[in-house]
Design a protein with these regions (language model features):
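Short, Lys/Arg-rich nucleic-acid/phosphate-binding segment
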Residues: 67-76
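Residues within the DNA-recognition helix of helix-turn-helix
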Residues: 53
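Pre-recognition alpha-helix immediately N-terminal to the DNA-recognition helix
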Residues: 23-25
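Alpha-helical DNA-recognition elements
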Residues: 56
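Short helix-coil-helix linker/hinge
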Residues: 16-21
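Interfacial catalytic loop of ABC nucleotide-binding domains
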Residues: 12
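C-terminal regulatory/oligomerization modules of transcriptional regulators
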Residues: 1-9, 28-47, 59-64, 81-120
Length: 120
């Protein structure tokens, strides 16, 4: 496996999620799988624009597409949860960094010597 793969996945996910319309699509697809037409109606977007956004989400691996047996032309989209794992891991690292920083700041702020309350 290419050692750059996790960073490439993370970059693709963040690039895909950088657009508010795509985040709204993800929010809707987290509720339930939907057809492209449903998404277009709910988001008030042209089919062409929706198709471009869905392509970005699919390329990032965040959304998957499936046909239905009744009509091969109809595509149903759903969230691919495993693709969010690199984002979740990165966010956990950032959260831990901030937790440590805040802990250090608290220790500094509560230090009696710094506050002039130190007795020899």
């Amino acid at each position: 496996m290419d050692p750059r793969a996790p960073n490439l996945q993370l970059n693709a996910a963040f690039a895909a999620l950088s657009d508010a319309s795509r985040r709204e699509m993800i929010r809707m697809l987290l509720q339930k799988p939907r057809r492209a037409g449903e998404l277009a109606e709910c988001i008030d977007m042209s089919p062409q624009a929706l198709s471009r956004h869905l392509r970005v989400l699919r390329k990032a691996g965040l959304v998957s597409e499936q046909g239905i047996e009744e009509d091969a032309r109809v595509r149903v989209y759903s969230v691919h949860p495993a693709a969010f794992q690199p984002v979740q891991q990165w966010m956990a690292q950032v959260e831990e960094l901030w937790r440590r920083q805040l802990h250090s700041f608290k220790a500094y702020a509560e230090n009696p010597r710094r506050l002039g309350r130190h007795r020899p």
